[in-house]
């Protein structure tokens, strides 16, 4: 698990390995599950119908689970079978990541991953059409703000803390906006533009700064 985590993101690997036992496995599970579906959404060789279908299949496979002990890995194997040669290891091993977390919190991670996969499928069906800032708010919540809410729940489960959830949403939106800025040229090359109409880098930078500023207490 740690090897794949390090290969996938050195940025997230370092803070995750410093977490105490139990929380470390939960956060690693959440990160790898989310990264697994993110790789589907951004896959350069799949068209949007294939992306949407795969994400919906993942969502349904996770919705059908009951516990870590009875987790049906075959459901995900079947979801990936038509595209397994095209998908990265972090995606095809999603079932392994799903059962990394302690059994008491793992279903919360499945629920979050399932919901996010469903939202990603919806946006893929729409061709990731972002017309207004309201569209951008909806997209950044669906694929990132909700991650902040999940992390709040993981901390709440482990420490009995209740972080401010509105800060978590802003933090996720801000990070996603930074990703959109960084990947803008690559996204355009594959026919996707996450910028609202009339926006350039200046407006997206301002959006990212505003969201990150509103979340300062969360990141502290």
Report the location of each language-model feature.
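Acidic catalytic motifs of isoprenoid enzymes
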Residues: 1-220
């Amino acid at each position: 698990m740690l090897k794949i985590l390090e290969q996938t993101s050195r940025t997230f690997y370092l803070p995750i390995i410093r977490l105490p036992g139990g929380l470390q496995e939960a956060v690693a599970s959440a990160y790898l599950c989310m990264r697994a579906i993110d790789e589907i959404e951004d896959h350069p060789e799949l068209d949007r119908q294939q992306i949407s279908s795969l994400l919906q299949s993942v969502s349904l496979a996770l919705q059908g689970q009951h516990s870590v002990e009875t987790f049906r890995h075959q459901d995900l194997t079947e979801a990936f079978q038509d595209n397994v040669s095209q998908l990265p290891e972090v995606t095809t091993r999603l079932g392994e990541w799903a059962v990394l977390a302690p059994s008491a919190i793992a279903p919360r991670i499945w629920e979050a991953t399932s919901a996010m996969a469903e939202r990603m499928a919806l946006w893929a069906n729409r061709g990731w059409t972002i017309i207004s800032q309201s569209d951008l708010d909806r997209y950044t919540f669906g694929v990132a703000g909700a991650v902040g809410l999940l992390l709040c729940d993981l901390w709440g489960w482990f420490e009995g803390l209740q972080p401010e959830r509105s800060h978590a949403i802003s933090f996720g939106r801000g990070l996603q906006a930074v990703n959109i800025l960084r990947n803008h040229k690559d996204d355009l090359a594959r026919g996707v533009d996450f910028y609202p109409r009339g926006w350039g880098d200046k407006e997206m930078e301002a959006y990212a700064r505003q969201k990150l500023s509103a979340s300062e207490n969360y990141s502290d």
